[in-house]
Amino acid sequence: MTRPASVLAGPKSRPPIHSQGDKTIEYAEKLLSVFILVPFAGSLIAIFFPSDQRGAISWFAGAIALVCFLVTAGLYPYVASGGVLHYRIDWVPELGLNFTLRMDGFAWLFSALITAIGVLVALYARYYMAEEDPVPRFFALFLAFMGSMLGVVLSGNLILLAVFWELTSIVSFLLIGYWHHNAHARDGARMALTITGTGGLAMFVGLIIIGKIVGSYELDAVLASGDAIRNHPLYGTVLVLVLLGALTKSAQFPFHFWLPHAMAAPTPVSAYLHSATMVKAGVFLLVRFWPVMAGTEAWFWIVGLAGLTTLLLGAYFAIFQQDLKGLLAYSTISHLGLITVLLSLGSPLAAVAAVFHIVNHATFKASLFMAAGIIDHESGTRDIRRLGGLFHFMPITATLAMVASAAMAGVPLLNGFLSKEMFFAEAIETHLVNPLDTVTPYVATIAGMFAVTYSLRFIHGVFFGRPPADLPRKPHEPPRWMRAPLDFLVLACLVVGIIPAQTIGPFLHTAVLSVLREGTPDYSLSVWHGWNIPLIMSFVALSGGIGLYFLMRSYLATAVEGPPVFRLLQGQRIFERVLVTLSWKWARWLEQRLGTRRLQPQMRLLVFLALAAGASPLLLGNFELPPLVIRGIDPAFALLWAIGIACAIGSAYQAKFHRLASLVLLGGAGLVTCITFVWLSAPDLAVTQLLVEIVTTVLILLGLRWLPKRIEEPVAAEDISIRVRLRRLRDLLLAIGAGGGMMLIAYTVMTRPLPETIASYFLERAYREGGGTNVVNVILVDFRGFDTLGEIAVLCIVALTVFALLLRFRPQSDSLEAPEQQKVQNAFDDDHPDRAAGDSVAEYLFIPAVIMRWMFPVTGMLAAFLFLRGHDLPGGGFAAGIAMSIGFILQYMSGGTRWVEERLRIHPLRWMSIGLLVATATGVGSWFFGYPFLTSHAQYASLPVVGKFPLASAILFDLGVFSLVLGATVLILIALAHQSVRAPRAHAKAARSDKEAVR
């Protein structure tokens, strides 16, 4: 999108949300945009750190997180009394997609958790990660995940929320699979991405429907439309879709099974993802939409049933885990179920308790994961059956872990006790008269008892009892700074548990006020509320949990991992069976019913479906064909197209047995198309078409070299079976139908009365606003730059896919044989003892090789020429990238793979990534001036000799296109060229090296 140069002189005006005199609020709002971009910028920088600089990169990541935390703390005064900070940039306003950031008290609380625990995890990871681990990749992903989570909690637009939501799924997939050499890590990452990603897509559909109901995707408008959403006929559909996203993210039943398998990630990842970030995103969404979707019976049943089941099963499963991280994973599932139950009740006090427990759980669970990591790091195992008596070896760590475990169990004078008491108090209240409401207090008490049992097992089974005898390493206290995050978190558990009103009270009130607004109830954070039913429930849970542990202690010390009743009912097994059924069994069934693995039946089916889809509306819609009008036809143009049609038909006819001839004819059809563009005054298209024809012809020729040979055997007409004749007739009819249909559609479109088009709009504004006279190029890189960005992203994906497919490809055995001409040349060398194998080849290619090497700088200059003139004359980044790739193709053809790669630094993946980043950064840069994404700036400069010439920021975008197109083409070229390196030489003497064979 383009703005005139005069408009771009100053920042975009926007009606201020606050008084214009309050400059500090305006600065605070602008700070939001910088605040959310800092982690992503840090992620890009972190990846370039050397692998051996573990300390430097950890301090860098910690500094990024600390800066974000300090900014969050500095913004608290603006939201403390119910205020809301906004920062908005129009992105794609036609679709309702704006880059809107919104910080209220609840978003502030989550931002503080994300950044504060991020600082502690960065410090902890400095000592946890091994020297051989790729630490730059870890911290780059860590910072990217921090930025993604901040994007989720600060999103003020539903579409933007969905974008960041899925980004958290993708980055968490990479973090969980960080140790990708481990099969468990790969499986856990795949499971997490599949479940949370699918739930996110369902949530995305629900958010779109909410936007349609409200009439806006802005979160402020949605939060003000609770009655409209709840009373809408699509409320049930929206509720299910949004809850699918929330329940899958927070590992609620029946989607809970992915979380324990995510424990294959490094412990710092577990401490971060499962305390303040990923799994909390689901309950964040429930709290965020609580004012507009809660309070209905459907909400109570769906959310409450999922939460109660998760609360009970998670606690029960945690008791029987033998892996420390597995125990903590299932306890996390249970506590998330507790929060979900609170949010299902529809009571404002329950919502307060839910927000409070989110904070409490983040502190004690992060500390427990860190303690488990220290035990694993210093002893070499996390198996509870092998541990015991560690208090004598690491007393400080043991004391800290015991306090955190007591907080998890809900022991008085710790933060977990306070929110658990609030949970019990709400559980005994009557919300809706139904069986689920009746059983809630009993389930809550039993789950609390189970929580005491698994917490006591963590304490007693690890730190007391018989000392360990066969540990991989002798246990000892960790480095001081590795334990420092644990010290801080446990201290927070103690301080909040003793003086909650003076510590967490103001921040909790700020968060609750932003969610409940005028419905905020009166509540107390006092440690002592007298003798009441919740206190009795706590006493029953504590005493019952202690008794249950000592009854089961001997069994748990030797038992197989997993609960006795549900040991065979494993979510992973069900998940794998579903995947196998969908991706293999059903695929094989469809393959048997619809065709074979051969390409021809598959293409036949695709053409038939396309023909049916295109013909159905024409046949059923009562369309009338336009009258056939034959106007004056230029004989030369008709002859040109007759040649092109003949080439196309000949190429298809010869494709099976005469591939080279078919390729030549295909190039002829492409050349006719190129001439047609010239004929119809489209030189830009003609230049691009010509360059693409050159490159694709050579690449296809390289690919044909490695296909199995096909020899045509003459068959008499009378020997062809009726079945074969019918099959050929069927294919002919399909081809005629599809081709005729396309011809009919083209004729209909071209003979319609020409309505008013947008061509005049582009013609009038291309030079004035885009700074270029080449309207086609200005459209591609300016007016429709967002489309071009998507297209080059697709090109990047295609190139990577081709490279991945050819990476393990090995040619057919019959394609390894040397060509006949090379056989003759090698035989001549064999007959002369004074000649080495390959001398004839080297002599034969010497002159072409020298000429092609001279052509390399020429093609480089041609590419630069096309690139620089593209804004005013035919050319541009795409054509320049193709032209530059021709230079590399010539070098590979003349010098061979090894010769070229020994002399040139060819990094196509780097070129592609730089191109995509430059193109995207060009669009993002416009945000800093208050304009929508990819808004360009154009002005004119004057030099003494050159004179007046245009300068447009779109040239940077075009540079990104050039880099990506060049990288993608060369990557495919390398994938094909490397087949010659992998394939063994048929001639024994020529097998010495590619270098000797072609130089």
From Swiss-Prot:
Provide an example Pfam family for this protein: MnhB
Q: Which GO biological process categories is it annotated with?
A: potassium ion transport; proton transmembrane transport
Q: Which GO terms describe its cellular component?
A: plasma membrane
Q: Name one GO molecular function term.
A: monoatomic cation transmembrane transporter activity
Q: What does this protein do?
A: Part of a K(+) efflux system which is required for the adaptation of R.meliloti to alkaline pH as well as for the infection process during symbiotic nodule development.
Q: How does it sit in the membrane?
A: Multi-pass membrane protein
- According to the record, the segments passing through the membrane are 31-48, 63-85, 106-128, 138-160, 162-181, 191-213, 233-255, 270-292, 299-321, 336-358, 389-411, 442-464, 488-510, 530-552, 604-621, 636-653, 660-682, 686-708, 729-751, 788-807, 846-868, 878-900, 913-935, 955-977
Q: Could you give the subunit structure recorded for this chain?
A: May form a heterooligomeric complex that consists of six subunits: PhaAB, PhaC, PhaD, PhaE, PhaF and PhaG.
Stretches the record annotates as Disordered: 1-20
Source lineage: Bacteria, Pseudomonadati, Pseudomonadota, Alphaproteobacteria, Hyphomicrobiales
Q: Which UniProt keywords apply?
A: Antiport, Cell membrane, Hydrogen ion transport, Ion transport, Membrane, Potassium, Potassium transport, Transmembrane, Transmembrane helix, Transport
Species annotation? Rhizobium meliloti (strain 1021)
Q: What family, per the record?
A: In the N-terminal section; belongs to the CPA3 antiporters (TC 2.A.63) subunit A family.
Q: Where in the cell is it found?
A: Cell membrane
Q: PANTHER family from the entry?
A: NA(+)/H(+) ANTIPORTER SUBUNIT, NA(+)_H(+) ANTIPORTER SUBUNIT A
Protein's name in the database: Probable K(+)/H(+) antiporter subunit A/B
